[in-house]
Regions:
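Positively charged, low-complexity terminal tracts
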Residues: 1-82
Length: 82
């Protein structure tokens, strides 16, 4: 697993050693967990279709997301089959 990020106003992709997600309450943590469960299902379907990779954004999944809020992106890269 590799972790990447951007500075708040930056455009340069940075490879990170670790990342912190600070939740203001269990509701936000539950939202992330629900998002990850849904991503797992969607990415499993993409793997079955033999897609080389897929990605999902929290902003596309969360209908309460507002411009300017942080996004959380999950990328799954699937190994090529012989």
């Amino acid at each position: 697993m590799r972790i990447f990020g951007y500075q708040k106003d930056g455009q340069e992709l940075l490879e990170l050693r670790e990342a912190t997600i600070s939740c203001s309450g269990l509701d936000e943590l539950d939202k992330i967990i629900d998002f990850l469960i849904e991503v797992r299902k969607e990415h499993a379907l993409e793997a079955e279709l033999m897609s080389p990779m897929c990605h999902s954004h929290l902003r596309d999944w969360d209908n309460t997301w507002k411009k300017g809020e942080p996004d959380f992106i999950i990328v799954s890269e699937f190994e090529s089959l012989p």
